[in-house]
Swiss-Prot record:
Homology family: Belongs to the RNA polymerase alpha chain family.
GO molecular function: DNA binding; DNA-directed RNA polymerase activity; protein dimerization activity
Catalytic activity, reaction form: RNA(n) + a ribonucleoside 5'-triphosphate = RNA(n+1) + diphosphate
Domain of life: Bacteria
Keywords assigned by UniProt, alphabetized: DNA-directed RNA polymerase, Nucleotidyltransferase, Transcription, Transferase
Protein name (database record): DNA-directed RNA polymerase subunit alpha
GO cellular-component term (any): DNA-directed RNA polymerase complex
Native species: Sulfurovum sp. (strain NBC37-1)
EC number, UniProt record: 2.7.7.6
Length: 333
């Protein structure tokens, strides 16, 4: 049965699962029905569109008048060289908005992205090929790397680069992928709540969690325009997560998510037991005396406790017990 509400439910849980250095899943729940997509869609767009990255915006190649030219002794023509250059991902070490770099290579050499590393910039995908030179080749070029967001076509950059340089399409965004999925999640016995799972992958210029955090900051700053005029109250009473909250999390698993048989679950549900922690707080005799919990269901319940690390040898610390009792009272109020 639904209760009358005077405010939407505040989500309380956030989980960060780092799959690799460049990929992470960020999970948040529980949201009121419809709220998850309302928040997830604009956040995804901000992750993709507002994440700051670095890209080459121009290159000047000695001996090349335009991008369709050739350089003596270089296997690739200038157009292919430029494509290879645009695929390389950089970081400016001191965080500057722009840096100009000069390079010179000669003689037989397989030039790769890692050959561009120096005191000013770091290449994050150093194994990419750049150019193949023969024994009489000489490759001298100057490029400009800039900080930016999104994508800027070369036509829009021509006024910003030197007249004798070739303007490049600039792919600044460091985010390769930003997806989300929304799933139902049970809160007590109410299935009408939602969980958002963001799947974010970057190119290593920044990490996925940093990209997500930056998007949240941009969203907050964009919305703050209303606060000065409309006196919007953006404060929240949601408490910060404490060590106690983290310590109690294993105890707060819902009974209906423990994989018990229908008979065992129904017996516990009729007894008003909603959380694993309630069973942990009970003695062996108290569990045995749960109404309609037969021997088979009792054995299954005890096995479940053991599987979750709460077997007969488990001892609950007094302060943890007190915190758990208080938390369960709040959840079941």
């Amino acid at each position: 049965m639904r209760k009358i509400k005077v405010a939407p439910f505040m989500p309380t849980e956030v989980e960060v699962n780092e799959i690799s250095a460049n990929r992470a899943e960020i999970v948040a729940y529980p949201f009121e029905s419809g709220y998850a997509v309302t928040l997830a869609h604009p956040l995804r767009r901000l992750i993709l569109g507002s994440s700051i990255g670095y890209a080459p915006i121009s290159v000047k190649i000695e001996g090349a008048a335009h991008e369709f030219d050739n350089i003596r002794g270089m296997h690739e023509d200038v157009a292919v060289f430029i494509i290879n250059l645009k695929n390389i991902r950089f970081k400016i070490k001191d965080g500057s908005d722009r840096v100009e770099l000069k390079y010179s290579f000669s003689g037989y050499k397989e030039v790769t992205a890692q050959d561009l590393n120096n005191d000013q910039i770091e290449v994050v995908n150093g194994d990419l090929p750049l150019a193949t030179l023969n024994e009489d080749a000489e490759l001298n070029f100057t490029m400009v790397i800039a900080k930016g967001i999104g994508y800027v076509p070369s036509e829009d950059l021509r006024d910003e680069v030197a007249p004798d340089s070739i303007a490049l399409d600039a792919f600044f965004t460091p985010v390769r992928k930003a997806n989300y999925k929304i799933e139902p999640v049970l809160v007590e016995d109410n299935p009408n709540f939602e969980k958002i799972t963001f799947d974010i992958e970057t190119d290593a210029q920044i990490g996925p969690v940093e990209a997500f955090t930056n998007a949240l900051e941009v969203m907050n700053k964009q919305l703050s325009v209303f606060n000065g005029v409309l006196d919007v109250d953006i404060s929240t009473t949601l408490p910060k997560r404490t060590n106690d909250d983290n310590e109690l999390k294993p105890f707060l698993a819902a009974v209906d998510a423990l994989g018990l048989s229908a008979r065992s679950f129904n017996s516990l549900d009729r007894a008003g037991i909603k959380f694993l922690g309630e069973l942990v707080l009970m003695s062996e005799n108290e569990i045995k005396n749960i109404k309609n919990l037969g021997k088979k269901s009792l054995d299954e319940t005890n096995e479940c406790l053991v599987e979750h690390g709460f077997g007969p040898e488990f001892e609950l610390k007094e302060n943890t017990r007190a915190n758990l009792v208080k938390k369960l009272e709040q959840l079941k109020a």
